[in-house]
C-alpha cells in the first residue's frame, strides 16, 4: 500500500520501483528512495509481503539523507581515484550535507578539494549503477583486507559473528555501508566541497588525527546556488552583528550603511 492510499497487488516478489511503475505508469526522476514499513530503502528493494510504502524525494528529510549519503560515496570514490593510498573511515549524511574522514598522505588544501570536485563531476557523468550486496563477516573481512582498508576491517571485526554485512559498489569503488543509496551516481547533479578540518579517529584524541572533508549536494544547480547564497548572506550578517557588538565599527545613515566607520577598538 502506497502513502497516497493506492494499493498494488502482486503474486510474485517485486521491487519498489517496478511496483510504483506498474501502479502509476512511470516513476518521476525526483523519486530517490522509499520508506518501506517506516525504514528507508533503495528503490531496487524487493517486496515479498504486505508493506506500507512512501516514495521519497529531496523534499523529504529521509530522501535528503539518502541523496547526501550517495554524494559522500561519490566524494570518497573521487579521492580514491586521485590518491589510491588514502584509507577511508566513516562518511555519513548530516542535517546540512555530508562528510568523509580520510587517512591520507597528502593535505586536502583548497586546491586539492577543487581537484576532487572535478573528479566527482566525472563520476556523476559516468552515471555508475550503485549495487548492494550482502556478505558474511568472513567474506567482508577478506574483501576489505584485499582492498587494504584497515579502518573498515576494524569496524567489521567489531560486529557479531553472524552479522550480514552490506557492501555497495559503483564502478571500481567498493565500500562497507548500511545504505540506502540512490540508483546511480548520475542523480547527484550539483555539489560543492566546503571545507576540510581535523578529526580524531572515533572522536578519541588518543587516536590518529584524520582529515574530514565536508560537502553539500542538491538535485539541481539552482538549489545549490540558492543555498550557498543564503549561507554567504548569513555569514555577512554574523560579521556585521559581531563587529557592532564588539564596537569595532558602526554605520550612520547619512554616510551610508555600506561604509563602516571604524571605532577605536577597530
Short names for language-model regions:
Residues 1-72, 76-79, 83-94, 118-122:
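Ubiquitin-like/PB1-type beta-grasp interaction modules and other compact soluble beta-rich domains
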Amino acid at each position: 500500500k502506497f502513502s497516497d492510499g493506492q494499493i498494488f497487488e502482486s503474486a510474485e516478489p517485486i521491487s519498489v520501483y517496478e511496483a510504483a511503475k506498474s501502479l502509476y505508469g512511470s516513476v518521476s526522476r525526483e523519486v530517490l528512495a522509499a520508506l518501506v514499513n517506516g525504514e528507508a530503502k533503495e528503490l531496487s528493494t524487493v517486496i515479498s509481503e504486505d508493506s506500507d510504502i512512501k516514495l521519497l524525494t529531496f523534499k523529504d528529510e529521509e530522501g535528503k539523507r539518502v541523496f547526501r549519503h550517495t554524494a559522500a560515496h561519490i566524494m570518497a570514490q573521487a579521492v580514491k581515484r586521485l590518491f589510491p593510498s588514502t584509507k577511508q573511515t566513516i562518511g555519513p549524511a548530516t542535517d546540512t550535507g555530508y562528510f568523509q574522514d580520510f587517512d591520507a598522505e597528502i593535505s586536502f588544501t583548497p586546491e586539492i578539494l577543487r581537484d576532487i570536485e572535478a573528479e566527482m563531476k566525472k563520476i556523476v557523468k559516468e552515471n555508475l549503477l550503485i549495487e548492494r550486496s550482502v556478505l558474511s563477516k568472513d567474506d567482508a573481512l577478506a574483501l576489505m583486507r584485499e582492498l587494504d582498508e584497515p579502518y573498515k576491517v576494524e569496524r567489521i571485526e567489531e560486529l557479531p559473528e553472524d552479522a550480514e554485512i552490506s557492501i555497495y559498489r559503483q564502478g571500481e569503488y567498493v565500500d562497507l555501508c548500511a545504505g540506502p543509496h540512490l540508483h546511480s551516481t548520475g542523480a547527484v547533479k550539483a555539489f560543492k566541497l566546503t571545507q576540510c578540518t581535523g578529526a580524531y579517529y572515533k572522536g578519541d584524541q588518543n587516536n590518529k588525527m584524520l582529515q574530514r572533508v565536508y560537502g553539500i549536494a542538491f538535485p539541481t544547480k539552482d538549489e545549490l546556488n540558492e543555498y550557498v547564497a543564503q549561507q554567504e548572506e548569513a555569514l555577512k550578517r554574523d560579521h556585521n552583528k559581531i563587529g557592532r557588538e564588539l564596537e569595532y565599527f558602526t554605520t550612520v545613515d547619512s554616510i551610508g550603511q555600506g561604509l563602516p566607520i571604524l571605532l577605536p577598538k577597530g
